[in-house]
């Protein structure tokens, strides 16, 4: 179960930054837009509005995101990424890439070249099973 090990390692990386996996997912969604409402973030994460608010509160406390009033509609509050949030995302992703490189270092060039094709094939097959 490779995914179990990769996820476990990912959680360990996040602990270094005192961020939970759902908080990191939220941070990534916030980073994908120039501003996102709590409601939109809730929908994207399939979480209750209150749960998403708690996540954003924690991220704001860590100075990774900030709430702003929308310029076009003062009733809307947008969540935007702070520079420290961008830095955390980059550091975490780089550590994940490094981990994948480490665990594939024993593969020869031919195996490494085949790996993406094999993974794509497995993904297509799994999607067939899900979608009938």
Give residue spans per PLM region:
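Charged, amphipathic alpha-helical coiled-coil/dimerization segments
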Residues: 7, 57-114
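C-terminal regulatory/oligomerization modules of transcriptional regulators
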Residues: 110-132
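Long, low-complexity, charged/polar intrinsically disordered regions in eukaryotic proteins
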Residues: 1-5
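Residues within helix-turn-helix
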Residues: 38-39, 50, 57, 77
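Short, flexible helix-adjacent loops and helix caps
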Residues: 11-15, 70, 104, 127, ...
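N-terminal helix-turn-helix DNA-binding core of bacterial DNA-binding proteins
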Residues: 8-48
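Short helix-coil-helix linker/hinge
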Residues: 17-22, 51, 82, 105-108
């Amino acid at each position: 179960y490779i995914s179990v090990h990769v996820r476990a390692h990912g959680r360990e990386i996040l602990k270094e930054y005192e961020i939970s996996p759902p908080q990191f997912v939220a941070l990534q969604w916030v980073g994908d837009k120039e501003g996102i409402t709590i409601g939109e973030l809730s929908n994207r994460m399939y979480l209750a509005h209150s749960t998403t608010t708690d996540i954003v509160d924690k991220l704001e406390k860590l100075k990774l995101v900030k709430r702003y009033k929308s310029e076009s509609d003062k009733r809307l509050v947008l969540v935007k990424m702070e520079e420290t949030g961008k830095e955390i995302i980059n550091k975490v992703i780089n550590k994940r890439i490094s981990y994948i490189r480490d665990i594939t270092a024993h593969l020869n060039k031919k195996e490494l070249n085949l790996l993406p094709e094999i993974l794509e094939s497995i993904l297509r097959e799994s999607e067939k099973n899900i979608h009938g």
